[in-house]
């Protein structure tokens, strides 16, 4: 979840700078004798056909859990102050992930607190339309995903951007990687990924199954999460499905 402005206004440059390597002092080494090496092939733009190189398949039975973050009407309906413009485009890849990883699928919802406290008071002063109870229409799952969620049990609700906490940890206990999809990349997805990684979870972010407050913020958030590898891996939906299948062989 994210109000307009996204990560572009909140320190993406600082996060990138923190991950930059330090250049060593001293003169450059002498070039090696012999012909120059062949140039390395550039990265493919096509999704990988198999599991991502470097990811360990893991023991049989340690299947991933899919956590679909905040696919709610408040983020998907035109005219909403919190619309994620590409919300509709991620419904299809989320459906493929849910089919491949069922029944280990959890849908979350962002909901407002009954009485905001601390800095949240000012937040809801800026967004008063969102200060509604959890059963308000705007906080319900979007109809385009509600059918998927119906087979997965009750949603996991939280009044925080991050959905990682004791409730989610208990539901995925003993499982494999945590696969994240949903909205918004630059707020609730990012917050959940980093909190879960800090707790020692392996996190796979299905980048093409996430939508941001805008394209630039979406891309910056994915770049920031890549800095946290190997705890956090940004993958395509096809890569997630292939890597998940490899864990059960």
Where are these regions (language model features)?
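Acidic/polar short surface loop at catalytic or gating sites that assists cofactor/ion binding
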Residues: 114-134
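Short, glycine/acidic-enriched loop or turn micro-motifs at the edges of active sites
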Residues: 73, 112, 211
């Amino acid at each position: 979840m994210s109000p307009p402005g996204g990560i572009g206004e909140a320190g993406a440059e600082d996060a990138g700078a923190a991950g930059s390597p330090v250049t060593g002092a001293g003169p450059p080494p002498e070039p090696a004798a012999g012909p120059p090496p062949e140039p390395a092939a550039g990265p493919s733009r096509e999704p990988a056909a198999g599991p991502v190189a470097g990811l360990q398949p893991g023991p049989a039975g340690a299947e991933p859990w899919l956590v679909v973050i905040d696919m709610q009407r408040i983020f998907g309906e035109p005219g909403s102050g919190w619309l994620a413009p590409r919300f509709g485009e991620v419904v299809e890849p989320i459906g493929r992930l849910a089919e491949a990883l069922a029944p280990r699928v959890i849908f979350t919802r962002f909901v407002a607190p009954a009485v905001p406290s601390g800095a949240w008071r000012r937040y809801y002063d800026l967004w008063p339309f969102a200060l509604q109870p959890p059963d308000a229409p705007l906080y319900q799952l979007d109809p385009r995903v509600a059918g998927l969620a119906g087979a997965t049990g009750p949603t996991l609700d939280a009044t925080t951007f991050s959905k990682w906490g004791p409730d989610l940890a208990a539901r995925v206990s003993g499982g494999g990687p945590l696969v994240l999809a949903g909205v918004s990349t630059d707020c609730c997805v990012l917050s959940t990924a980093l909190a879960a990684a800090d707790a020692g979870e392996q996190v796979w972010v299905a980048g093409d199954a996430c939508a941001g407050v805008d394209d630039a913020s979406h891309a910056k958030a994915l770049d920031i999460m890549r800095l946290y590898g190997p705890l956090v891996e940004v993958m395509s939906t096809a890569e997630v499905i292939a890597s998940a299948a490899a864990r059960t062989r």
